[in-house]
């Protein structure tokens, strides 16, 4: 249906099913049908339909019939009443000597849905053959009315003792004594295996005439035959008509009671030549034609007693015996000696027993046919695990006959060298259908190579097989292939999944079991993982039974149920796996344990069947076998509740107050809550279901913004009855008062559930039971309700440029600063030594419409740490930053949440501290403004501000020097011996200490030491140089040793200052790296060269060692003074006798006297030598005496 504009429908959860321990199989009301536990009632179970009435067919393979444990099958009504034994264990197979004790009838059951018949098998049914019992197995078919209709025994073959033996006995007068002949008869008859399907014996006595002592079918046991033979009297006669007796036996004895196909054996016993020997040739020819094997016994008593040569007699008897004579001819000395040939005669008659070279003679004797069974279109597949020396086989019984594949047909997958492994092929049988190959049979061999194997094959009427594919197990002893099930998930008559059980798979120290999943892909089954059992590690034998069942959860896909009969301490459990599309979901939808159904259940899950609706409610039900019980689990209908919610009006306009609530103006709205139930099963399209629901407003807020008119912010436990397919709606009135947050929508939550979850319909697994819909606030923007902001961000820092630093800090004029900045990039900014922070002044302005959820994103380079944000104005707008420890160099700040108003502006200051651990040659600060409202691209360029500066750092260092020698006086009597033959020693130290915040690098220390004059005279010798920092690398340049040892005359009085500008020097250059507060010292150790200092001409001499700090070309550090330097000066003075010439002394004296005379003359001319007399002023008194 179409809803009006503004309808909000909840997003439902995915329909893909999830996990649950309780779904739609009812565990509260099971039907538990009890039977005899000792009979293993429940070992197999099948659902059965007879004219609409539902039954369970339950196998009890250890059931007793009379004194024998034959096993049997019960029919059980599914609703009420007791089970009835069908007495199929009393069924007898004629014409065989059968043994029915422990034949395990009901060990396998197979139903035929076409005619509602079923097959119950007795794989251990056996019959007697000679000295052996052959366990060939047998199955009994019952019709739809549970009545026996047919015996199926394809492995049953005629015994090698299937013989009709006629003894032709000479009873003429010459036979004596007769009692010895009777003893011979009794002894030889006791060696015969007489019984149905084995040996029949008839006796003909002849002389002059021939009579039947008894016919072949007169007696069916050794006891009866021996009893009858013991009463045979000698009939006598004067003639011995052996030819007549043989013909009589051939033509009459083999016809009266003889069996078709039975081997004909004739034993002729006589004591003399025949009176009708001319007829022997014809008689023997007729016997050969009838395939009568003849054993002839010549009794020589008559000849020996009379001393007659028996040669002619013996030749006649040999002629009567079949060829070769050595195997068919016997002679004894007399009648008493007949007892001596009993064993030999018996052995020769049965010489072929057990050694027949027919290819199947040893193949099917122990086949145990019916160990597994499976109904197909044209017959029945039967597993024969004991066939071919227990390698196993699969036989097929059809209306046209039976198909028994040759042993060689299996050799491709079951090679001869592994025949002693007892593969047990046929342990389970099933079939699959592919679009290309049609029906393909599947059989498991769980003991093949100890790991198990499954083969997929086609069977042909010429007894050959075509094996299409083989699947192999992975673990020794896991019994892979002991259970196999094919699944047509989507019901398109093509198999989608093949499941293979390995119930003894060992995992986590337990026999947990495993079920392998194979999907059909291009007519081959491809491994696709395993089904999941419970996570409780126990001996469960998960996969002992796997059943493909009809759609249980009514989603149109067939499902699978897996039994774990040993789980939960042998109480047992079953797992229900749902089908989906062409797959079986790996995780169980429901796990049902025996303990939750009824007390005392054991081995629950040993058999499973689910194909019929047993209680006429339109749903498929489950039948599960347990030890001594059969359990019926009823399916519950599945319903889907579709919930929807819409509001009138569709948005909350807090600027429009249209009602009063609790005396306050409010905005009133209505919510319409609607439910539509959908039953998945067609049978329930007119059903009803009751639900209960709760409604809550703004459930996740401590103070809800919306309230229900009925009071509060929620109401609970409302009940409503819904009809299938019909919509039911309810109006819920609510209101909104003033709120500060009108950006986030108001959430309206509804939780609903079935009114009676334990009975009636079941809510579909995975179907949502919660509906959350939000009603938004009107945003106050233009008519299309789409806000378009225009954010403008501006930012600048307080860092000085190189020019500003030069003028303000260094105090230089602009002209000098122009040349100062030439060594830097014009974009370089200077970090003064006292600076620890960087400040950014910024403004954010919204020149457009409201910006909802506006944010300011702040990020900085790693050498900065965010310190603070200070708002600079008193506007209503605010900025609040969120601390995120995981994002150290990023910060997100909310601007005037929930929205930044149109035409609003906010100014703020950002402070960043320099990092103590990260040092970079640049810094970067990025500011970006954004919001949930969409800004036009044409105005988005000014939403960001990027401050990126290349930096130079002002180094703050303390640079000092000290020296052990500052002045030395060279005296004439100065001796070198007191100075180790060199001169006075000195020790200079230059110390540099980093007083700043940043680590210093890219700086060199250059020390120049004057070593000698330009004339080659040594001034001092540098003996050693070292530093106190191991990470300081230094290079020394210049020659400090190769100067002349004898000084030459050189006058230094005109240039007494000796330094790097006028002397040969040694230069020491070191790379300097200093962490904050770290210091390093440079040490120079040497001696003044006294020999030269005494020889050179000077009065006073100063030798200066200079140390200067120099920045490298790309160094990030600068100094306030250009290349700061420190000097150490050695001041040297010299005492010496000066010889002045006489003419200089005389000239100087006369010159001095002349100069004195001229000075006196000048003073005289000026009146310097006259007395000064003052005139007294009038009025003055006399001059004081003291003044005079």
Swiss-Prot record:
Domain named VWFA: residues: 164-345
Extracellular side: 23-1141
Signal peptide segment: 1-22
FG-GAP repeat residue numbers: 24-85, 91-151, 355-406, 411-461, 462-527, 528-586, 590-650
Keyword tags: Calcium, Cell adhesion, Disulfide bond, Glycoprotein, Integrin, Magnesium, Membrane, Metal-binding, Receptor, Repeat, Signal, Transmembrane, Transmembrane helix
GO molecular function, one term: metal ion binding
Glycosylation sites: 82, 95, 291, 331, 358, 449, 462, 528, 642, 694, 857, 894, 973, 1031, 1039, 1059
Regions of this protein lying in the Cytoplasmic compartment: 1165-1188
SUPFAM superfamilies recorded: Integrin alpha N-terminal domain (SSF69318), Integrin domains (SSF69179), vWA-like (SSF53300)
Any matching Pfam family: Integrin_A_Ig_1
Glycoprotein found in the keyword field: yes
UniProt-annotated binding residues for Ca(2+) 2: 551, 553, 555, 559
Residues that coordinate or bind Ca(2+) 3: 613, 615, 617, 621
PROSITE patterns: FG_GAP, VWFA
Known partners and oligomeric status: Heterodimer of an alpha and a beta subunit. Alpha-11 associates with beta-1. Interacts with RAB21.
Function: Integrin alpha-11/beta-1 is a receptor for collagen.
UniProt free text on domains: The integrin I-domain (insert) is a VWFA domain. Integrins with I-domains do not undergo protease cleavage.
Alphabetical list of PANTHER family matching this protein: INTEGRIN ALPHA, INTEGRIN ALPHA-11
UniProt family annotation: Belongs to the integrin alpha chain family.
Protein's name in the database: Integrin alpha-11
Organism per entry: Mus musculus
